[in-house]
């Protein structure tokens, strides 16, 4: 079974990686600096090997651990090194669609920006989305949409389900 994760920035089957669309540390640092200025938000830095959080608010930690089984608490997200950085997930206590997305949608010219749930939004490398990743994998495997089964549970799965 092949899994497409982190908004399409990563795909793997067992130990075989099919796709990895990471972001460089400087880019991620700039994004984190901007997000930290938005009231009511907490950040998950999603890497290939683990997710990283610095905020310790109980509701946020509970929500982050619900979606990331490998989740490390760190003193500062900017100190994370040695992992491929795939996505920044923003948890917004005030509602992603109403609060953080309007303040971050200007990033869409250079990044994939998606509201992924009532309180979640994601920022990843431009072109990283589950539909495009699925299409690439279908081409590599020589299979059609009719021969593909997908499962999704959030708004960021829509492009994959349509594919």
Model-flagged regions — what are they?
Residues 1-25:
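Alpha-helical substrate-recognition element adjacent to the catalytic core
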Residues 30, 34, 38-151, 155-160:
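Conserved acidic, metal-coordinating active-site core of Asp-based
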């Amino acid at each position: 079974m092949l899994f497409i994760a982190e908004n399409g920035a990563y795909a793997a089957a067992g130990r075989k990686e099919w796709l990895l669309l990471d972001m460089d540390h400087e880019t991620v640092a700039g994004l984190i600096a901007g997000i930290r200025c938005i009231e009511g938000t907490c950040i998950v830095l999603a890497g290939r090997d683990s997710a990283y959080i610095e905020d310790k608010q109980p509701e946020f930690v509970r929500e982050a651990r619900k979606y990331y089984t490998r989740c490390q608490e760190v003193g500062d997200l900017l100190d994370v090194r040695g992992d491929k950085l795939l996505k920044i997930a923003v948890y917004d206590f005030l509602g992603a669609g109403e609060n953080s997305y309007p303040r971050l949608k200007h990033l869409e010219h250079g990044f994939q920006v998606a509201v992924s749930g009532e309180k979640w939004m994601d920022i990843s490398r431009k072109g990283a989305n589950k539909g495009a990743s699925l299409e690439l994998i279908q081409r590599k495997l020589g299979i059609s949409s009719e021969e593909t089964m997908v499962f999704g549970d959030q708004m960021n799965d829509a492009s994959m389900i349509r594919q």
